[in-house]
């Protein structure tokens, strides 16, 4: 699958061009017909010398046949962990297709697990880019770099921010409305990535979505004795449940 890290005749590491797979699709989401392109593949992030230091594997869904002067939003999505690929939000929540799990989600149940259209996806209102951080999914370090070079809060956020700037440059999306969407530890990552994008890379964000926020692990858990703050953090979700 990877187009990276093969061996040159002299025994050195040979980094090839990124591998990508592109297909065209059409479906109806939230009552709207959407023709879209699915791109599964690698994007290289580079060091200060311009050499690839890691490949991040992503699944991107972008709408086709845009109206004249239409500026389509793009949302960058990841799970948490740290150590989780984006499979769960991709195939279980926000992607255009989902895996059907014949259970109440406490256990996956027994196979087979069919794949069906996901009418609740948000692809009707925004393009979607599901990102696997370095060391998860098919994403990995390249050349002389190692996974541990990317496995810290700051290092992780820097690699994700570098990916976003690379992606919007390669795809001509600097002027698109841009959003981050993270889950659990992914909310911590989103806050860190947003700071780097805004302060260091001159990328302005239109919004951030926190799912199962974990910005403060100690303060947001009800399992710490007498921690009343945790219940306050649940109020927005409880309100949403009662009004939906």
Regions found by a protein language model. Give the residues of each.
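Residue in the alpha/beta-hydrolase core beta-strand immediately N-terminal to the catalytic nucleophile
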Residues: 179, 207-209
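Alpha/beta-hydrolase fold nucleophile elbow
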Residues: 173-184
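Conserved small/polar residues in nucleotide/adenosyl-binding loops
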Residues: 242-243
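Glycine-rich nucleophile elbow surrounding the catalytic serine of serine-hydrolase chemistry
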Residues: 182-192
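Active-site nucleophile loop of the alpha/beta-hydrolase fold
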Residues: 209-219
């Amino acid at each position: 699958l990877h187009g990276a890290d093969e061996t040159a005749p002299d025994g050195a590491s040979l980094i090839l061009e990124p591998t990508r797979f592109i297909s065209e699709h059409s479906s109806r989401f939230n009552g709207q017909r959407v023709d879209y392109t699915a791109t599964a593949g690698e994007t290289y992030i580079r060091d200060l010398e311009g050499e690839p230091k890691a490949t991040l594997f992503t699944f991107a869904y972008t709408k086709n046949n845009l109206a004249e002067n239409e500026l389509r939003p793009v949302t960058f999505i990841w799970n948490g962990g740290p150590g989780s690929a984006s499979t769960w939000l991709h195939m279980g929540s926000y992607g255009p297709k989902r895996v059907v799990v014949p259970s109440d989600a406490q256990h996956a149940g027994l196979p087979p697990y069919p794949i069906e259209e996901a009418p609740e996806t948000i692809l009707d209102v925004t393009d979607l880019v599901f990102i696997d951080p370095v060391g998860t999914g098919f994403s990995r370090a390249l050349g002389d770099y190692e996974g541990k070079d990317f496995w810290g809060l700051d290092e992780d956020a820097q690699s994700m921010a570098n990916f976003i700037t690379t992606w919007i440059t390669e795809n001509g999306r600097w002027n698109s409305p841009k959003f981050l969407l993270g889950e659990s530890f992914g909310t911590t990552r989103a806050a860190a990535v947003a700071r780097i994008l805004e302060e260091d890379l001159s990328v302005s964000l239109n919004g951030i979505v926190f799912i199962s926020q974990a910005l403060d692990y100690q303060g947001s858990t009800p399992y710490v004795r007498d921690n009343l703050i945790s219940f306050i953090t649940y109020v927005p979700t409880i309100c949403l449940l009662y009004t939906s």
